[in-house]
Amino acid sequence: MISLRFQPSTTAGVLSASVSRAGFIKRCGSTKPGRVGRFVTMATAASPLEICVKASITTPNKLGDCPFCQKVLLTMEEKNVPYDMKMVDLSNKPEWFLKISPEGKVPVVKFDEKWVPDSDVITQALEEKYPEPPLATPPEKASVGSKIFSTFVGFLKSKDSGDGTEQVLLDELTTFNDYIKDNGPFINGEKISAADLSLAPKLYHMKIALGHYKNWSVPDSLPFVKSYMENVFSRESFTNTRAETEDVIAGWRPKVMG
């Protein structure tokens, strides 16, 4: 198990084992060009939340390809909540993990000494405990784009080019394109919200998996879908928490080949 500690507000983190390292925290990876790295001491940082996430199956010590884990991490990043990320090999789940997550599922987050599963429950708890900045999506907008993921999976798994699954996906994307055209740039207008943080990782998987396995991409006739994806994928919170392309491809392989 690898533990990575992050302080989103300072873009800083530390690689650790079972014992936390004192001193400075620095996010793993390179700093952006022209940007000076900033550091905070452990003593002045807020106590990080512990979160168990899927580990990469292609690269040691990297975040894996779970879109639901990324949804929670995006929420923490956007709210500047520091977190201690524990990467779990889901193909060989350790005993300590099964004790806190008997079903063996990720993500799970520790709130007040209690481990909480389910990305929807976790993000709601984060909204209640860390209300600023507010990320809740109004109920009437919360389901926008919610059918895209299932239709993407249906098309990805399809082995019959004439079964209509591609058109079903295109219909959902067209509906979303028209919505963003009239209401964007995000689902709740000018500011990103929980619905975007849920949808963005799924669109990322759609882009990579369909590009690799179907040689398919969002058509130019849906410019607002494409601009939406560019907007969310380019956010620092997203680049900090996205899976490697190779992991997304490997993660979907069993569903495609099965």
UniProtKB/Swiss-Prot annotation:
Residues 1-42 form a transit peptide. It catalyses: RX + glutathione = an S-substituted glutathione + a halide anion + H(+); L-dehydroascorbate + 2 glutathione = glutathione disulfide + L-ascorbate. SUPFAM superfamilies: GST C-terminal domain-like, Thioredoxin-like. L-ascorbate binds at residues 54, 65, 255. Signal peptide: none annotated. Glutathione binds at residues 54, 65, 93, 106, 119, 205, 252. Residues 56-129 form the GST N-terminal domain. Partial S-glutathionylation and intramolecular disulfide bond formation between Cys-66 and Cys-69 in the presence of oxidized glutathione (GSSG). Could be reduced by TRX-dependent process. It is found in: Plastid, Chloroplast stroma. Coiled coil: none annotated. It comes from the Eukaryota. GO terms for cellular component: chloroplast; chloroplast envelope; chloroplast stroma; plastid. Its EC number is 2.5.1.18, 1.8.5.1. Its main location: plastid. One of its GO terms (molecular function) is glutathione dehydrogenase (ascorbate) activity. The modification S-glutathionyl cysteine is found at residue 52. Keywords: Chloroplast, Detoxification, Disulfide bond, Glutathionylation, Oxidoreductase, Plastid, Transferase, Transit peptide. One of its GO terms (biological process) is L-ascorbic acid metabolic process. Monomer. Interacts with TRX3. PANTHER family: GLUTATHIONE S-TRANSFERASE DHAR2-RELATED (PTHR44420), GLUTATHIONE S-TRANSFERASE DHAR3, CHLOROPLASTIC (PTHR44420:SF1). Belongs to the GST superfamily. DHAR family. Displays a dual function. As a soluble protein, exhibits glutathione-dependent thiol transferase and dehydroascorbate (DHA) reductase activities. Key component of the ascorbate recycling system. Involved in the redox homeostasis, especially in scavenging of ROS under oxidative stresses. This is Glutathione S-transferase DHAR3, chloroplastic.
